[in-house]
Design a protein with these regions (language model features):
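ATP/NTP phosphate-donor binding region
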Residues: 2-110, 316, 361
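C-terminal non-catalytic interaction/assembly regions of soluble proteins
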Residues: 3-35, 284-393
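Accessory alpha-helical/coil subdomains and C-terminal extensions
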Residues: 17, 21-31, 35-48, 54, ...
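Short glycine/serine/threonine-rich phosphate/pyrophosphate-binding segments
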Residues: 52-53, 127-132, 164-171, 289-291
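Short acidic, glycine/serine/threonine-rich loops at helix termini
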Residues: 53-57, 132-133, 163-166, 198-205, ...
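Short acidic, glycine-rich surface-loop motifs adjacent to enzyme active sites
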Residues: 113-128, 275-287
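Short Gly/Thr/Asp-enriched flexible loops that form oxyanion-binding sites at enzyme active sites
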Residues: 121-148, 290-299
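Internal gly/pro-rich beta-alpha loop/helix module
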Residues: 153-227
Length: 393
C-alpha cells in the first residue's frame, strides 16, 4: 500500500481565513495525510444519484453497488483498507426514518471493531442531511466517547456514468476524512461534498442540481479537503449532537409538519390534533412568529398533550422572542411550545420521532411535562433554553 506522506509528527497551524474567525488546522509535518495500513474504512452503500445509471429510456435509476463505486476511484485503496457493505440501492426519497434507525444500528456495530477507522455512507442527496442528522442524534454521548470515530456521508449531484461525474471525487475526499488520524476536533457525523466538510446538525441541501449544493447557513463548513490535506475548524466538535436516552427499538411516534402561511387559521394544526399525533413542528415566519388567528389551534394542540416545536421558514437564522405582537414567539412560549433554534423542520421532526419513541422519554413526559419540555429545549437550543423557560415562568 502506497503512502501519501511520510511524516509522523503532528503540528497545529493556526491561520485567519476571515476577520475574527480563528481556524485551527491539524496536519502532519509534511502536510499530508497519515496513511493507516492497519486500519479499515467501511463504505456503507445506501444508493442515490452517486449509484445511478441511465436506463433504456435515458432516465437515472439506482444500479451501481458499493464495489462498483469504489472501482471508479483511482487511488482509493492507497489510503487504507476498504470494505463495502451494500445496505440498499435506492433513491433517497425512498429512505424512511425506520431505515435511518437500522443504518444507525448497523454503523454503530461496525464502529465497535478495533480495526475500523471510520465509516463512509454513500447516499442520495435529497434526504442526505436528514439521515446525517438522525445519525448524529442517535449516537449517545457514551458511545461517542468510547468509539471516537467519524461517520462521513457523501453522494453526488450527477449520475455515475455522466460526463464530469462528481461521485468519485466526493467518495475519495470522504475516505480521506474517515481515515484522517487527528479526530479530537472532528464532529462524529459530517457531510463531505465538493471538498467541503459540514456538520450534520447544520448542513442543508440548498440547490437542486449544482454540485456545490450543500451549505451550512450562518455557520459555513467545519472543514475542507484540499488535495491530500484535511483541515478542520477549531471548535467544530461543539456542533455534535448526542443524547443520553437509549436508542429506541422502533420509531413508534407520530409527528407532523405544518408550514404557516398568510391568513392561516390553523386548520392543518387542528387536523393533526384530531389525528392524535405525538409531536408537531410548525414553520413560522422569520423569527418564528405565527398568524394571530392560528394561535387558538396551537393552544388546543398543546393542551391535548402534543409536543409543539416552532421553526422558521427561512433557511438561516434562529428562532427568537423579539416581538410582543399577537402570534409572536413570546405567545407561543407562554402556551408551552418549544423553540427550534436554527434547526430545519425536517430535522426537528426526526428529533421528535427519535425522542418520543423512547419509553423513558415518554415516562418523563407523563411525570413532569415541564421538565421534559425543558430537556427538549436544551436539545434544540441550549443557548436560549434557560432564558426562554424563565420567560414562561
Amino acid at each position: 500500500m502506497t503512502k501519501l506522506g511520510t511524516g509522523t509528527e503532528k503540528e497545529t497551524v493556526s491561520q485567519q481565513i476571515e476577520p475574527e474567525v480563528d481556524i485551527t488546522e491539524e496536519v502532519l509535518d509534511d502536510g499530508y495525510l497519515d496513511v493507516m495500513e492497519d486500519k479499515t474504512v467501511v463504505i456503507f452503500a445506501v444508493g442515490g444519484t452517486i449509484a445511478t445509471k441511465k436506463d433504456g429510456e435515458g432516465y437515472l435509476v439506482p444500479a451501481a453497488s458499493g464495489e462498483e463505486l469504489c472501482k471508479k476511484v483511482p487511488g482509493l485503496d492507497d489510503l487504507c483498507n476498504i470494505e463495502v457493505v451494500n445496505f440498499s440501492c435506492v433513491q433517497s426519497t425512498a429512505v424512511t426514518p425506520g431505515m435511518m434507525l437500522e443504518i444507525s444500528k448497523q454503523v454503530q456495530e461496525i464502529l465497535k471493531r478495533p480495526d475500523v477507522s471510520g465509516v463512509v455512507i454513500t447516499h442520495g442527496t435529497d434526504t442526505l442531511e436528514e439521515t446525517a442528522y438522525f445519525l448524529s442524534i442517535s449516537l449517545s454521548d457514551e458511545f461517542q466517547n468510547e468509539y471516537f470515530k467519524p461517520i462521513v456521508l457523501t453522494g453526488s449531484m450527477r449520475g455515475a456514468d455522466a460526463v464530469g461525474a462528481d461521485g468519485p471525487a466526493n467518495l475519495l475526499a470522504s475516505v480521506k476524512v474517515a481515515c484522517h488520524d487527528v479526530k479530537e476536533d472532528i464532529p462524529r457525523v459530517v457531510v463531505c461534498m465538493n471538498n467541503e466538510i459540514h456538520a450534520a446538525s447544520r448542513v442543508q441541501k440548498v440547490h437542486s442540481d449544482n454540485i456545490a449544493a450543500f451549505k451550512s447557513p450562518s455557520w459555513g463548513p467545519v472543514g475542507y479537503v484540499d488535495d491530500d490535506l484535511v483541515y478542520f475548524r477549531a471548535g467544530a466538535l461543539d456542533l455534535d449532537m448526542g443524547f443520553n436516552f437509549p436508542t429506541p427499538e422502533k420509531l413508534t411516534a407520530k409527528v407532523g409538519i405544518v408550514k404557516a402561511v398568510t391568513g392561516d387559521k390553523g386548520e392543518l394544526v387542528d387536523y393533526f390534533t384530531s389525528q392524535k399525533v405525538d409531536g408537531l413542528v410548525i414553520e413560522g415566519f422569520g423569527r418564528g412568529n405565527l398568524p394571530p388567528e392560528m394561535m387558538p389551534s396551537v393552544k388546543k394542540a398543546i393542551d391535548s398533550g402534543i409536543e409543539v416545536v416552532i421553526t422558521s421558514r427561512t433557511p438561516a437564522g434562529r428562532i427568537l422572542d423579539s416581538y410582543g405582537t399577537p402570534g409572536s414567539v413570546k405567545d407561543s412560549i407562554q402556551l408551552g411550545a418549544v423553540m427550534g433554534g436554527e434547526s430545519t423542520s425536517a430535522k426537528v421532526r426526526l428529533l421528535l420521532l427519535y425522542i418520543l419513541s423512547q419509553p423513558k422519554a415518554q415516562e418523563l413526559r407523563r411525570e413532569d411535562p415541564e421538565l421534559f419540555r425543558a430537556y427538549l429545549q436544551e436539545c434544540l437550543d441550549p443557548v436560549l433554553s434557560e432564558r426562554l423557560f424563565s420567560i414562561k415562568a
